[in-house]
Amino acid sequence: DLHCQVRVGGYGGAQGLAQYIREQRIDLLLDATHPYAAQISQNAALAAGLSGVLCWALRRPAWVAQTGDDWREVADWAHLVQALKPFHRPLFTLGREPLAHRDEIPESQFWTLRALDHYPGNERCDVIGARGPFLIDEERALFEQRRIDVLISKNSGSSATEPKLE
C-alpha cells in the first residue's frame, strides 16, 4: 500500500501529464509502468522535464533462465515466425501485437493469444481476454487443455507473471 495519492493514466500524452503535474503541484513523478510501456515512460520523462520535477523510474529485474529452461530470443516478428516453425500450438502472451498477424498463421499451427481484452479469433486462432496474475495451476491447466507446445512472451520480469514459465 502506498501512503499517497495514486492516479492511473488518461493524461493526454506528455503535455497533458506536464499540465496535471503543474496543476496538482506534484514535486516527484514515479514511473512504475510495465517494462514494455516505452511510450508511457518516454512521456513521463518528458513531462517531468517540462514541469521541472524529478522523475524516478521503478524497474523490475528480468526473469533469468534456470537450468533446463529452453529460452530462445528473437529480434523481431520475422525471426519469431521462423523460430516457431517446428511448433504447432503456441500461446502468445504479448498483448495485442499478434492480433495483426491472425491471417498469417501457417496451416500446421493453431495459435492461442492471451490479451487483456477479448478479440475475435478465426479458424486458426483463439483469443482469450484475461488479466493476470494467474495461478500456476491455472497456467498448467491452460497448457494441458489447449495442448500448448511453446510459450511466446516478453521478458517483463515480475513474480506475479512468472507462473506461465513454470
Label every PLM stretch briefly:
Residues 17-78:
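Glycine/small-residue-rich loop that forms an oxyanion/phosphate-binding "nest" at active or ligand-binding sites
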Residues 27-28, 89, 149-150:
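Structural motif
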Residues 1-10, 69, 121-126:
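N-terminal beta-loop-helix "entrance" segment that forms/cooperates
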Residues 1, 58-64, 77, 96-99, ...:
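Short, polar loop motifs at secondary-structure junctions
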Residues 124-166:
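A C-terminal functional module that forms or caps the active site or interfaces directly
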Residues 78-111:
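Internal active-site segments that recognize and position negatively charged phosphoryl groups
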Residues 4-21, 128-138:
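Glycine-rich, highly charged phosphate/nucleotide-binding loops
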Residues 102-133:
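Histidine/lysine/aspartate-rich catalytic loop segments that bind and position anionic ligands
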